[in-house]
Protein backbone atom coordinates (compact mmCIF):
# COMPACT_ATOMS: atom_id res chain seq x y z
CA UNK A 1 0.00 0.00 0.00
CA UNK A 2 1.20 3.52 -0.72
CA UNK A 3 2.83 5.55 2.00
CA UNK A 4 0.85 8.40 3.49
CA UNK A 5 1.62 12.13 3.29
CA UNK A 6 0.24 14.10 6.22
CA UNK A 7 1.42 17.46 4.89
CA UNK A 8 -1.04 17.63 2.00
CA UNK A 9 -3.84 20.21 2.20
CA UNK A 10 -7.41 19.18 1.52
CA UNK A 11 -9.45 19.88 -1.58
CA UNK A 12 -8.99 19.35 -5.29
CA UNK A 13 -5.81 20.68 -6.78
CA UNK A 14 -4.12 20.97 -10.14
CA UNK A 15 -1.70 18.36 -11.38
CA UNK A 16 1.29 20.53 -10.51
CA UNK A 17 0.30 20.51 -6.83
CA UNK A 18 0.39 16.73 -6.47
CA UNK A 19 3.60 14.77 -6.11
CA UNK A 20 3.41 11.43 -7.86
CA UNK A 21 6.25 9.39 -9.31
CA UNK A 22 5.43 6.22 -11.22
CA UNK A 23 6.92 3.19 -9.49
CA UNK A 24 9.18 0.75 -11.39
CA UNK A 25 8.64 2.88 -14.48
CA UNK A 26 11.73 1.82 -16.44
CA UNK A 27 11.24 -1.83 -15.54
CA UNK A 28 7.62 -1.70 -16.71
CA UNK A 29 8.61 -0.13 -20.04
CA UNK A 30 11.39 -2.69 -20.53
CA UNK A 31 9.06 -5.65 -19.95
CA UNK A 32 6.40 -4.18 -22.25
CA UNK A 33 8.99 -4.25 -25.08
CA UNK A 34 6.99 -1.57 -26.91
CA UNK A 35 6.58 -1.98 -30.65
CA UNK A 36 6.33 1.19 -32.73
CA UNK A 37 2.90 1.37 -34.32
CA UNK A 38 1.43 -1.05 -31.78
CA UNK A 39 -1.71 -0.83 -29.66
CA UNK A 40 -1.25 -0.71 -25.89
CA UNK A 41 -3.58 -0.54 -22.90
CA UNK A 42 -2.71 1.32 -19.70
CA UNK A 43 -5.37 -0.15 -17.43
CA UNK A 44 -4.58 2.24 -14.57
CA UNK A 45 -4.03 5.69 -16.07
CA UNK A 46 -3.65 7.65 -12.82
CA UNK A 47 -1.82 10.89 -13.58
CA UNK A 48 -0.50 9.45 -16.83
CA UNK A 49 3.13 8.81 -15.90
CA UNK A 50 3.33 5.32 -17.42
CA UNK A 51 1.09 6.34 -20.34
CA UNK A 52 3.40 9.23 -21.21
CA UNK A 53 6.40 6.89 -21.34
CA UNK A 54 4.49 4.43 -23.54
CA UNK A 55 3.28 7.20 -25.87
CA UNK A 56 6.83 8.51 -26.41
CA UNK A 57 7.80 5.13 -27.86
CA UNK A 58 4.75 4.29 -29.99
CA UNK A 59 5.11 6.61 -32.96
CA UNK A 60 2.38 8.31 -35.00
CA UNK A 61 0.91 4.99 -36.19
CA UNK A 62 0.55 3.70 -32.63
CA UNK A 63 -2.53 3.73 -30.42
CA UNK A 64 -2.59 4.07 -26.65
CA UNK A 65 -5.80 3.24 -24.78
CA UNK A 66 -5.85 4.30 -21.13
CA UNK A 67 -8.62 3.90 -18.60
CA UNK A 68 -9.34 4.90 -15.03
CA UNK A 69 -12.32 4.90 -12.66
CA UNK A 70 -11.35 8.30 -11.30
CA UNK A 71 -12.74 11.21 -13.35
CA UNK A 72 -10.41 13.65 -11.57
CA UNK A 73 -7.38 11.58 -12.57
CA UNK A 74 -8.62 11.32 -16.15
CA UNK A 75 -8.81 15.09 -16.53
CA UNK A 76 -5.38 15.65 -14.99
CA UNK A 77 -3.82 12.92 -17.14
CA UNK A 78 -5.47 14.39 -20.23
CA UNK A 79 -3.71 17.70 -19.56
CA UNK A 80 -0.40 15.93 -19.00
CA UNK A 81 -0.65 13.89 -22.21
CA UNK A 82 -1.48 17.03 -24.20
CA UNK A 83 1.85 18.58 -23.17
CA UNK A 84 3.78 17.09 -26.08
CA UNK A 85 7.37 18.25 -26.61
CA UNK A 86 7.91 19.97 -29.96
CA UNK A 87 10.29 17.26 -31.16
CA UNK A 88 7.61 14.58 -30.62
CA UNK A 89 4.51 16.31 -31.98
CA UNK A 90 4.71 14.73 -35.42
CA UNK A 91 5.43 11.32 -33.89
CA UNK A 92 2.74 11.34 -31.17
CA UNK A 93 0.32 8.38 -31.20
CA UNK A 94 -3.46 8.33 -31.14
CA UNK A 95 -4.56 8.35 -27.49
CA UNK A 96 -7.97 7.24 -26.24
CA UNK A 97 -8.88 7.94 -22.60
CA UNK A 98 -11.79 6.03 -21.08
CA UNK A 99 -13.71 6.41 -17.82
CA UNK A 100 -14.00 2.73 -16.98
CA UNK A 101 -13.02 0.04 -14.49
CA UNK A 102 -11.11 -3.17 -15.23
CA UNK A 103 -14.41 -5.03 -15.25
CA UNK A 104 -15.74 -2.72 -17.98
CA UNK A 105 -12.66 -3.08 -20.16
CA UNK A 106 -14.12 -5.84 -22.34
CA UNK A 107 -16.91 -3.69 -23.75
CA UNK A 108 -14.48 -0.93 -24.73
CA UNK A 109 -11.75 -2.96 -26.43
CA UNK A 110 -13.65 -6.02 -27.64
CA UNK A 111 -12.41 -5.57 -31.20
CA UNK A 112 -8.85 -4.58 -30.34
CA UNK A 113 -5.74 -6.72 -30.64
CA UNK A 114 -3.35 -5.48 -27.97
CA UNK A 115 0.44 -5.59 -28.14
CA UNK A 116 0.70 -4.95 -24.42
CA UNK A 117 -1.22 -4.28 -21.22
CA UNK A 118 0.09 -2.46 -18.14
CA UNK A 119 -1.67 -2.32 -14.77
CA UNK A 120 -0.21 -0.32 -11.86
CA UNK A 121 -2.55 -1.31 -9.05
CA UNK A 122 -3.76 0.28 -5.84
CA UNK A 123 -4.18 3.91 -4.87
CA UNK A 124 -2.18 6.81 -6.27
CA UNK A 125 -0.31 9.44 -4.30
CA UNK A 126 -2.71 12.01 -5.75
CA UNK A 127 -5.69 10.23 -4.22
CA UNK A 128 -3.96 9.86 -0.85
CA UNK A 129 -2.90 13.50 -0.77
CA UNK A 130 -6.40 14.83 -1.40
CA UNK A 131 -7.97 14.69 2.07
CA UNK A 132 -11.39 15.34 0.56
CA UNK A 133 -11.33 11.88 -1.02
CA UNK A 134 -11.15 10.19 2.38
CA UNK A 135 -8.38 7.68 1.66
CA UNK A 136 -5.85 8.87 4.24
CA UNK A 137 -5.89 8.32 8.00
CA UNK A 138 -3.34 11.11 8.43
CA UNK A 139 -5.64 13.96 7.37
CA UNK A 140 -9.14 15.06 8.36
CA UNK A 141 -11.64 14.29 5.63
CA UNK A 142 -14.99 12.66 4.88
CA UNK A 143 -15.21 8.87 4.96
CA UNK A 144 -15.55 8.46 1.21
CA UNK A 145 -12.81 6.28 -0.38
CA UNK A 146 -14.50 6.01 -3.78
CA UNK A 147 -12.02 5.86 -6.66
CA UNK A 148 -14.95 6.65 -8.93
CA UNK A 149 -16.42 9.81 -7.35
CA UNK A 150 -19.80 8.86 -8.83
CA UNK A 151 -19.88 5.37 -7.30
CA UNK A 152 -22.78 4.35 -5.08
CA UNK A 153 -21.01 2.91 -2.02
CA UNK A 154 -18.88 4.98 0.38
CA UNK A 155 -16.72 3.96 3.31
CA UNK A 156 -19.05 5.90 5.61
CA UNK A 157 -21.94 3.64 4.61
CA UNK A 158 -19.85 0.52 5.26
CA UNK A 159 -18.56 1.77 8.61
CA UNK A 160 -21.94 2.91 9.92
CA UNK A 161 -24.42 0.44 8.42
CA UNK A 162 -22.64 -2.93 8.31
CA UNK A 163 -23.12 -5.47 11.08
CA UNK A 164 -20.22 -6.01 13.47
CA UNK A 165 -19.62 -9.51 12.14
CA UNK A 166 -19.67 -8.44 8.48
CA UNK A 167 -17.41 -5.48 9.23
CA UNK A 168 -14.91 -7.76 10.98
CA UNK A 169 -14.95 -10.09 7.98
CA UNK A 170 -14.23 -7.19 5.60
CA UNK A 171 -11.32 -5.97 7.74
CA UNK A 172 -9.88 -9.48 8.02
CA UNK A 173 -10.34 -10.55 4.40
CA UNK A 174 -9.22 -7.37 2.66
CA UNK A 175 -6.83 -5.97 5.26
CA UNK A 176 -5.36 -9.22 6.59
CA UNK A 177 -5.85 -7.64 10.01
CA UNK A 178 -5.75 -10.27 12.78
CA UNK A 179 -7.32 -7.80 15.24
CA UNK A 180 -10.36 -7.39 12.99
CA UNK A 181 -13.00 -8.43 15.53
CA UNK A 182 -11.66 -6.09 18.20
CA UNK A 183 -11.55 -3.22 15.70
CA UNK A 184 -15.05 -3.93 14.36
CA UNK A 185 -16.45 -4.00 17.89
CA UNK A 186 -14.87 -0.62 18.68
CA UNK A 187 -16.17 0.90 15.44
CA UNK A 188 -19.72 -0.26 16.10
CA UNK A 189 -19.63 1.17 19.63
CA UNK A 190 -18.34 4.53 18.36
CA UNK A 191 -20.97 5.00 15.64
CA UNK A 192 -21.78 7.28 13.95
CA UNK A 193 -18.31 7.87 12.48
CA UNK A 194 -18.19 10.52 9.76
CA UNK A 195 -14.53 11.41 9.26
CA UNK A 196 -11.22 9.70 8.57
CA UNK A 197 -9.66 11.23 11.68
CA UNK A 198 -12.44 9.91 13.93
CA UNK A 199 -12.16 6.41 12.44
CA UNK A 200 -8.37 6.40 12.76
CA UNK A 201 -8.64 7.47 16.41
CA UNK A 202 -11.14 4.70 17.20
CA UNK A 203 -8.92 2.09 15.56
CA UNK A 204 -5.78 3.39 17.26
CA UNK A 205 -7.35 2.94 20.69
CA UNK A 206 -8.77 -0.50 19.87
CA UNK A 207 -5.59 -1.85 18.30
CA UNK A 208 -2.74 -0.35 20.26
CA UNK A 209 0.57 -1.83 19.03
CA UNK A 210 1.84 -4.43 21.49
CA UNK A 211 5.28 -5.15 20.02
CA UNK A 212 7.94 -3.69 17.75
CA UNK A 213 6.53 -5.36 14.63
CA UNK A 214 3.10 -3.78 15.18
CA UNK A 215 4.69 -0.37 15.80
CA UNK A 216 6.17 -0.30 12.29
CA UNK A 217 2.84 0.70 10.73
CA UNK A 218 -0.04 2.88 11.89
CA UNK A 219 -2.79 0.80 13.59
CA UNK A 220 -5.34 2.05 11.03
CA UNK A 221 -3.34 1.07 7.93
CA UNK A 222 -4.85 -2.36 7.33
CA UNK A 223 -8.42 -1.32 8.14
CA UNK A 224 -8.27 1.64 5.75
CA UNK A 225 -6.86 -0.67 3.07
CA UNK A 226 -9.68 -3.15 3.66
CA UNK A 227 -12.40 -0.52 3.41
CA UNK A 228 -10.91 0.96 0.24
CA UNK A 229 -10.63 -2.43 -1.46
CA UNK A 230 -14.19 -3.36 -0.45
CA UNK A 231 -15.74 -0.04 -1.52
CA UNK A 232 -14.05 -0.15 -4.93
CA UNK A 233 -14.33 -3.90 -5.65
CA UNK A 234 -10.60 -3.81 -6.35
CA UNK A 235 -9.85 -7.53 -6.19
CA UNK A 236 -12.89 -8.55 -8.23
CA UNK A 237 -11.97 -5.96 -10.86
CA UNK A 238 -8.39 -7.25 -10.94
CA UNK A 239 -9.59 -10.81 -11.51
CA UNK A 240 -11.82 -9.57 -14.35
CA UNK A 241 -8.87 -7.80 -15.97
CA UNK A 242 -6.57 -10.81 -15.72
CA UNK A 243 -9.25 -13.10 -17.13
CA UNK A 244 -9.86 -10.77 -20.09
CA UNK A 245 -6.29 -10.10 -21.17
CA UNK A 246 -5.21 -13.41 -22.81
CA UNK A 247 -7.93 -13.28 -25.47
CA UNK A 248 -6.94 -9.72 -26.42
CA UNK A 249 -3.16 -10.00 -26.56
CA UNK A 250 -1.47 -10.72 -29.88
CA UNK A 251 1.14 -13.52 -29.95
CA UNK A 252 4.18 -12.34 -27.94
CA UNK A 253 2.09 -9.48 -26.56
CA UNK A 254 3.08 -8.50 -23.02
CA UNK A 255 1.19 -8.22 -19.73
CA UNK A 256 2.90 -6.25 -16.95
CA UNK A 257 1.32 -5.84 -13.50
CA UNK A 258 2.64 -3.84 -10.54
CA UNK A 259 1.05 -4.67 -7.19
CA UNK A 260 1.48 -3.12 -3.75
CA UNK A 261 0.21 -5.68 -1.23
CA UNK A 262 0.06 -9.43 -0.82
CA UNK A 263 -3.62 -9.80 -1.75
CA UNK A 264 -3.04 -8.26 -5.18
CA UNK A 265 0.26 -10.02 -5.75
CA UNK A 266 -1.19 -13.43 -4.88
CA UNK A 267 -3.98 -12.99 -7.44
CA UNK A 268 -1.52 -11.86 -10.14
CA UNK A 269 0.95 -14.64 -9.36
CA UNK A 270 -1.72 -17.35 -9.46
CA UNK A 271 -3.28 -15.99 -12.67
CA UNK A 272 0.02 -15.86 -14.56
CA UNK A 273 1.07 -19.27 -13.26
CA UNK A 274 -2.25 -20.80 -14.28
CA UNK A 275 -1.98 -19.11 -17.68
CA UNK A 276 1.49 -20.55 -18.16
CA UNK A 277 0.30 -24.04 -17.17
CA UNK A 278 -2.53 -23.74 -19.72
CA UNK A 279 -0.08 -22.79 -22.48
CA UNK A 280 -1.31 -19.20 -22.76
CA UNK A 281 1.71 -17.41 -21.29
CA UNK A 282 5.44 -17.55 -21.05
CA UNK A 283 6.44 -16.22 -17.65
CA UNK A 284 8.98 -13.41 -17.92
CA UNK A 285 9.44 -13.02 -14.16
CA UNK A 286 10.01 -16.20 -12.17
CA UNK A 287 10.12 -14.01 -9.06
CA UNK A 288 8.66 -10.52 -8.74
CA UNK A 289 10.83 -7.57 -9.70
CA UNK A 290 11.21 -5.08 -6.85
CA UNK A 291 12.55 -1.56 -6.60
CA UNK A 292 16.25 -0.88 -6.22
CA UNK A 293 17.55 0.75 -3.07
CA UNK A 294 18.19 3.87 -5.15
CA UNK A 295 14.53 4.05 -6.23
CA UNK A 296 13.33 3.41 -2.68
CA UNK A 297 15.48 6.30 -1.47
CA UNK A 298 13.94 8.57 -4.14
CA UNK A 299 10.40 7.25 -3.77
CA UNK A 300 9.60 5.41 -0.51
CA UNK A 301 6.22 4.15 -1.81
CA UNK A 302 8.14 1.86 -4.19
CA UNK A 303 9.32 -0.28 -1.26
CA UNK A 304 6.26 -2.54 -1.36
CA UNK A 305 5.91 -2.70 -5.17
CA UNK A 306 6.19 -6.02 -7.00
CA UNK A 307 6.22 -6.33 -10.79
CA UNK A 308 5.25 -9.52 -12.62
CA UNK A 309 5.21 -9.97 -16.38
CA UNK A 310 4.25 -12.54 -19.00
CA UNK A 311 4.21 -12.87 -22.80
CA UNK A 312 1.30 -14.35 -24.75
CA UNK A 313 2.17 -17.57 -26.56
UniProtKB/Swiss-Prot annotation:
The keyword Cytoplasm applies. It catalyses: cytidine(1402) in 16S rRNA + S-adenosyl-L-methionine = N(4)-methylcytidine(1402) in 16S rRNA + S-adenosyl-L-homocysteine + H(+). GO terms for cellular component: cytoplasm. One of its GO terms (biological process) is rRNA base methylation. S-adenosyl-L-methionine binds at residues 48-50, 68, 102, 120, 127. Residues 301-313 have a biased composition (Basic residues). Pfam families: Methyltransf_5. SUPFAM superfamilies: Putative methyltransferase TM0872, insert domain, S-adenosyl-L-methionine-dependent methyltransferases. Its EC number is 2.1.1.199. Its main location: cytoplasm. GO terms for molecular function: rRNA (cytosine-N4-)-methyltransferase activity. It is found in: Cytoplasm. Residues 290-313 are annotated as: Disordered. Gene3D superfamilies: Putative methyltransferase TM0872, insert domain, Vaccinia Virus protein VP39. Signal peptide: none annotated. Keywords: Cytoplasm, Methyltransferase, rRNA processing, S-adenosyl-L-methionine, Transferase. Belongs to the methyltransferase superfamily. RsmH family. PANTHER family: 12S RRNA N4-METHYLCYTIDINE METHYLTRANSFERASE, S-ADENOSYL-METHYLTRANSFERASE MRAW. Specifically methylates the N4 position of cytidine in position 1402 (C1402) of 16S rRNA. This is Ribosomal RNA small subunit methyltransferase H. The gene is rsmH.
Amino acid sequence: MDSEDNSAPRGERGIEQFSHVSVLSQEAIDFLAIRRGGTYLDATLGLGGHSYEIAKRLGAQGHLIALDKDTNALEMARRRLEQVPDDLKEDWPQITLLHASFAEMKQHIASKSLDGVLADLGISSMQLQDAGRGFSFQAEGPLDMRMNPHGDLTAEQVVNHTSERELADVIYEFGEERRSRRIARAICRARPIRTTAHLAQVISVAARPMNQAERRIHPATKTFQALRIFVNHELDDLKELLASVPSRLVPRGRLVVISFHSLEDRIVKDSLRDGASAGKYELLTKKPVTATEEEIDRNPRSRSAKLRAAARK
